[in-house]
Amino acid sequence: MSETATWQPSASIPNLLKRAAIMAEIRRFFADRGVLEVETPCMSQATVTDIHLFPFETRFVGPGHSQGMNLYLMTSPEYHMKRLLAAGCGPVFQLCRSFRNEEMGRHHNPEFTMLEWYRPHYDMYRLMNEVDDLLQQVLDCQPAESLSYQQAFQRHLEIDPLSADKTQLREAAAKLDLSNIADTEEDRDTLLQLLFTMGVEPHIGKEKPTFIYHFPASQASLAQISTEDHRVAERFEVYYKGIELANGFHELTDAREQQQRFEQDNRKRAARGLPQQPIDQNLLDALAAGLPDCSGVALGVDRLVMLALGAESLADVIAFTVDRA
């Protein structure tokens, strides 16, 4: 029998034991801080509208639903957790499976483990500090450094991402030999994301985790726009050793503005020939009922474990990656 028979786990048993210890450590971290662990559905009748996320879709055909009901596997537990927050649950965290019909490789698996938590009455900076505490505890790393999105572009690409026009962004892309992609791209945010991925990410978080905060307002997603600078959103990401670990927001609480953003996403999807997605009315109703002022973050657990173990690939820390599922 082949030594690489696909019935065998992707990860070694010693690595899976270490993974279990890290999961227990994460739970202790939140238990010590009085944060409630919750569970929410893996499937929903609505899904994300973000043009860069691709959910799995299935169909329920049980009794009473002879015509079938479209369901989507959750790309993150965010919407359901916000409904719990609006219902008065207080600070919460969740370790759960999430699903994205996208990449597969060293740092990606279509099914993955997400750690997501929400802190009422925390601003973005206070939550960044808590993320830093968790990373130091699990990874035994140095305290993180922080750069604004604008500072990161100015340092590594010598361009201001908040004021540069598309011509200037394409010129910056040309210096990275990316003209073949950039010259035909008309969406400014896609150009910015290309430059960030190829021109900024390789240079940050090498020795210690790096927070990038205050993303452009056009990339706010579900984050508030900064009251100090309306060009930027109260959003942050965390990078370490070439890997994006987490994405956090000072959460938007305005139901009307959130609906407008969802609708704008769907217009962008239509313009790109992508299917428009059903908007989560339950989330909008929860925001209208009163989501407390809060900040939240989603962190990729498989990537965290990979870094903690010094592994080369997610396959080294996941029992069965999709090619063995």
From Swiss-Prot:
It catalyses: D-beta-lysine + L-lysyl-[protein] + ATP = N(6)-((3R)-3,6-diaminohexanoyl)-L-lysyl-[protein] + AMP + diphosphate + H(+). ATP binds at residues 100-102, 109, 244-245, 300. Its EC number is 6.3.2.-. It holds the Pfam family tRNA-synt_2. Keywords: ATP-binding, Ligase, Nucleotide-binding. One of its GO terms (molecular function) is tRNA binding. GO terms for biological process: lysyl-tRNA aminoacylation. Belongs to the class-II aminoacyl-tRNA synthetase family. EpmA subfamily. With EpmB is involved in the beta-lysylation step of the post-translational modification of translation elongation factor P (EF-P) on 'Lys-34'. Catalyzes the ATP-dependent activation of (R)-beta-lysine produced by EpmB, forming a lysyl-adenylate, from which the beta-lysyl moiety is then transferred to the epsilon-amino group of EF-P 'Lys-34'. This is Elongation factor P--(R)-beta-lysine ligase. It comes from Salmonella paratyphi B (strain ATCC BAA-1250 / SPB7).
